[in-house]
Amino acid sequence: MEPAFWQQRWADNQIGFHQAQVNPYLQTYWPQLQLAPGSRVLVPLCGKSLDLAWLAGQGHRVLGVELSRRAVEDFFREHGLEAEVRQQGAFEVWRSGDVQLWCGDFFALRAEDVADCVGLYDRAAVIALPVQMRARYMQLLSGLLPANCRGLVVTLEYDQSLLAGPPFSVRDEELRQGFAGWQVEQLEAVDVIEDSPKFVQAGASSLLERVYQVSR
């Protein structure tokens, strides 16, 4: 999947993956991670998610990584924030207060960029990537993030033969294999097929949304 795909989705405003409210799983389960105030949290493929502002509101320093400059611009504009912009390596870094959005290719991140990220939040990153890219993505996370990191990961599981994706289906065993070396605990699994007409029309009988806590 090429970067141009996501750039075009944002250009055409085809952003059905964007949620108009803070994710309820985040609000429910994030507190149990017990991250200290001021902890830095990595949010891969963040878009203009409202979850970024929520995390900052909990006292965290937020590092979102997003390919689309349009998404980054929209986040700061929609929150009424003035951002300082600078170049750092392969990324254009936008900053306002405790929120930094790094505009560029996630796979260009270096270990020193995220060495102090002790939190991870992935609601729509791993499910946005086809199988080979998401294996590379999870391997990169494990290689970059420090040993004391913990966070939340949200996945979807359905019959992939019915829909091409994204979002892509990620099976439980694939997620656990991708986070080998981490402690992986499933916190919740909910069938959301009744709220997902696209999947119903495609013939899917279930759409399982899973929430995991990952830590090491």
Swiss-Prot record:
Keywords: Cytoplasm, Methyltransferase, S-adenosyl-L-methionine, Transferase. It catalyses: S-adenosyl-L-methionine + a thiopurine = S-adenosyl-L-homocysteine + a thiopurine S-methylether. It is found in: Cytoplasm. S-adenosyl-L-methionine binds at W10, L45, E66, R123. GO terms for molecular function: thiopurine S-methyltransferase activity. GO terms for cellular component: cytoplasm. PROSITE patterns: SAM_MT_TPMT (PS51585). Signal peptide: none annotated. Belongs to the class I-like SAM-binding methyltransferase superfamily. TPMT family. This is Thiopurine S-methyltransferase. It comes from Pseudomonas putida (strain ATCC 47054 / DSM 6125 / CFBP 8728 / NCIMB 11950 / KT2440).
